[in-house]
Design a protein with these regions (language model features):
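Mid-domain alpha/beta scaffold segments of enzyme catalytic cores
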Residues: 1-203
């Protein structure tokens, strides 16, 4: 079992879970640096009528030991795509099948994501990536068992109320290092020693 600090990054690096691009997914595994931890999934923005073919690649990658999470996948109300729900459900089922956490992309769809979580009752952790919501929304998600992942931009109050064992960190597309983001979070929480997401261990 390993503990990972940077749970979602679009830049490869030691100690980070690098999220493969759609182009990288289409190359048969394992071609990537096998020491690099990965996450695999179809971003809502990447979905086309051919998404099921791409998802076959996701399934192949998901079986590799270096793949530590499924996603990012979810719902995004800013874009109009008829494939989002079906694709998201497929990722939920894959997460459960391979026993790996699901990284959630959510834009203006929190209530719907919660309903889906209740519908499936997953055993695997769902990590709400890039969380910037207000504390009321954070409390709503925490109550349902979600993990919250904070990056460069975050709500100060939400960071303060999030239990350490439900708090994750990520660089996403930030120019800041994970250490810089960690230091900012610790400053807000006035804590130098607590262990974040200590009960979220990756296979």
């Amino acid at each position: 079992m390993i503990h990972i600090l940077d749970i979602h990054s679009h830049k490869p690096g030691e100690g980070a879970i690098y999220n493969l691009t759609i182009e990288e997914l289409r190359v048969p595994p394992p071609y990537f640096n096998q020491k690099q931890w990965l996450s695999v999934g179809l971003h809502p923005w990447s979905l086309t009528e051919e998404w099921r073919k791409d998802f076959l690649h996701v399934r192949k990658w998901a079986l590799l030991s270096q793949v530590k999470a499924i996603g990012e996948s979810g719902l995004d109300k800013i874009i109009k795509s008829p494939y989002q729900h079906e694709a998201f459900f497929a990722h939920v089922k894959l997460s459960e099948e391979v026993g790996k956490p699901l990284v959630i992309h959510c834009v203006k769809a929190v209530d719907e994501i919660i309903k889906i979580h209740k519908l499936f009752g997953p055993k695997q952790p769902w990590i709400f990536h890039g969380f910037r919501g207000k504390p009321q929304q954070a409390e709503q998600l925490l109550k349902e068992g979600f993990y919250l992942s904070f990056g460069e931009h975050f709500n100060l109050d939400s960071v303060q109320i999030c239990p350490a064992d439900k708090l994750c960190l990520e660089t996403d597309e930030s120019c800041f290092s994970i250490k810089e983001i960690e230091n900012r979070i610790r400053k807000v929480r006035k804590s130098e020693s607590e262990s974040f997401s200590k009960d979220l261990l990756f296979q």
